[in-house]
Design a protein with these regions (language model features):
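Structural marker of alpha-solenoid helical repeat scaffolds
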Residues: 17, 51-53, 87, 120-122, ...
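TPR alpha-solenoid repeat register
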Residues: 24, 31, 58-60, 94, ...
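Terminal, low-structured helical/coil segments at or just beyond the last alpha-helical repeat
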Residues: 118-171
Length: 171
């Protein structure tokens, strides 16, 4: 807690020194969001995006999307992730986050398309393999489900996703 307090003080000091420092606001927003202070985090992302000179607005949009999803505002999460992808359509991390969100929303075909794009752009991650496995399970393709499971256990045996697989916790 003492480290969090010091980190927050440093973020606030950086923003006081340069109110237009969008990178500091983006980082502070993520800091707040990961501590459950979603509304404050979303406000920092909004402040970062109000700067017309911000070189990487897609980062703040993607982070705002993830923060909104953590908050439970799936519509806002989707809107921000899609805005981020408009600016950087080949960002594998944002594609994967949107795929996960669309899976949660029951949009299985779009999830499949987004995962396919992700696979074209980046090597598999524990997160992408786990999502693929759960998607194929919902679609009823046991062969693909097993293939994802094998890759997950082989490539990422110590991951949280592999532990979930081994314990049968698919949801």
């Amino acid at each position: 807690l003492a480290e969090d307090k010091l980190a927050e003080e440093n973020f606030r000091r950086a923003i006081e020194l340069d109110r237009s420092d969008s990178e500091a606001r983006n980082n502070f927003g993520w800091f707040l969001c990961t501590r459950g202070r979603y509304d404050e985090g979303l406000e920092q992302f909004s402040a970062a995006l109000r700067n017309p000179l911000y070189a990487r607005p897609e980062d703040a949009m993607a982070n705002a999307g993830q923060c909104a999803e953590r908050k439970g505002d799936l519509a806002l999460a989707e809107a921000n992730l899609r805005k981020s992808l408009k600016l950087q359509p080949d960002n594998p991390n944002t594609l994967l986050k949107l795929a996960g969100l669309r899976f949660r929303q029951g949009q299985l075909m779009e999830t499949q398309q987004l995962l396919g794009r992700h696979a074209e752009l980046a090597p598999p991650t524990a997160e992408s393999l786990w999502l693929g496995l759960r998607l194929e399970r919902k679609l009823g393709d046991r062969v693909q489900e097993a293939a994802y499971g094998l890759q997950l256990r082989k490539r990422f045996p110590d991951s949280n996703e592999a532990r979930l697989l081994l314990s049968g916790q698919y949801e």
